[in-house]
């Protein structure tokens, strides 16, 4: 299983710290950077020396929006999986995120296990697009 490099975009320090800890403990992930607003996230992602396999982004940020981060991330020269993790994962918001290039959308309140499974499948070489079936 390959270790994935992840970039986290989350404005809440407590949620960000807990998410980093959970991802690094439960999935083959090393978090290589984080941002709390759109400008910082887009800036980090646009620097050629900063490469990651996975971007996990919240919709509502300290300033700007996760939607702007998604738009910018789809233009990266290196293919990167884009995941939205939000408390506002309504059907309409999920559709909007997928239209903007997100590979998956997870609800913070009840889909953390699904996010961990997604990350494990990615690290194991899966494409993990669309809905996932449980591992037998």
Report the location of each language-model feature.
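Conserved acidic carboxylate
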Residues: 10
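Two-component/phosphorelay signaling modules centered on CheY-like receiver
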Residues: 13-33
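Acidic, metal-coordinating helix/loop segments flanking the phosphotransfer/catalytic sites
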Residues: 34-54
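Acidic catalytic/metal-coordinating carboxylates
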Residues: 37, 65-68
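The short loop immediately C-terminal to the conserved phospho-acceptor aspartate in CheY-like receiver
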Residues: 59-60
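Short amphipathic alpha-helix used as the core "switch/output" element in two-component signaling
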Residues: 67-78
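Alpha4 helix (beta4-alpha4-beta5 surface) of REC/receiver domains from two-component response regulators
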Residues: 68, 89-106, 110
């Amino acid at each position: 299983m390959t270790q994935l490099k992840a970039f986290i975009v989350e404005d809440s320090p407590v949620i960000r710290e807990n998410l980093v800890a959970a991802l690094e403990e439960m999935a083959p992930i090393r978090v290589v950077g984080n941002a709390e607003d759109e400008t910082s996230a887009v800036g980090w992602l646009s620097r050629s020396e900063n490469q990651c396999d996975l971007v996990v982004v919240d919709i509502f940020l300290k300033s700007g929006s996760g939607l702007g981060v998604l738009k910018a991330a789809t233009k990266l020269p290196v293919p990167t999986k884009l995941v939205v993790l939000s408390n506002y994962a309504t059907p309409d918001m999920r559709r909007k995120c997928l239209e903007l290039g997100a590979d998956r959308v997870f609800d913070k309140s009840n889909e953390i296990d699904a996010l961990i499974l997604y990350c494990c499948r990615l690290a194991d070489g899966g494409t993990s697009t669309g809905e996932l079936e449980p591992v037998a």
